[in-house]
Amino acid sequence: MASEKLLFNNDGLSLTNIKKYILPLFSLENATVSMIKFKDTDKQRAVFKVETQSNSYCLKKVYYNEENLLFVYSAMEWLYRNNLNVPRLIPSKNNSRFVLFNSMIFILTPWIDGDKCDFDNPTHINLSCQTLGKIHKVSKNFFPIEGSTERKG
């Protein structure tokens, strides 16, 4: 999985830097961007909503390394190809699945509106169990892309 690599010595998570350095790599120069979530923990992550006149996207700063991202990407593609409704990583202009900026990895997916799972709601629990069963069933033959982190279990 190829990456776009940019290195700067300033705050990579500022909206200005996201708009100036990250969005153009996805041909989103004229988009607006807003921060939705930020967690400043050991596994720092952030979520941005990117909007154009016709589409909305989710730009995520992920906390894992390239090999783990490759495993996650492998799993997402496997689930998608087995008819599970998962977001797909949108490639950059150079067909990369992520962008590396200030040693941070960013991915872009379509924006998906939805409700947070309410574990007190029997309908939500039933749907979650059905989906988990489908994931379990199609994952039996899963194999990750070469070069990704090997996970067992």
Language model segments and positions:
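Conserved NTP-binding catalytic cores of kinases and kinase-like/nucleotidyltransferase enzymes
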Residues: 1-91
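Short amphipathic alpha-helical patches
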Residues: 46, 99-103, 132
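Mid-sequence acidic-hydrophobic segments that form the walls
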Residues: 82, 92, 108-115, 131-142
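Conserved structural core of kinase catalytic domains
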Residues: 93-127
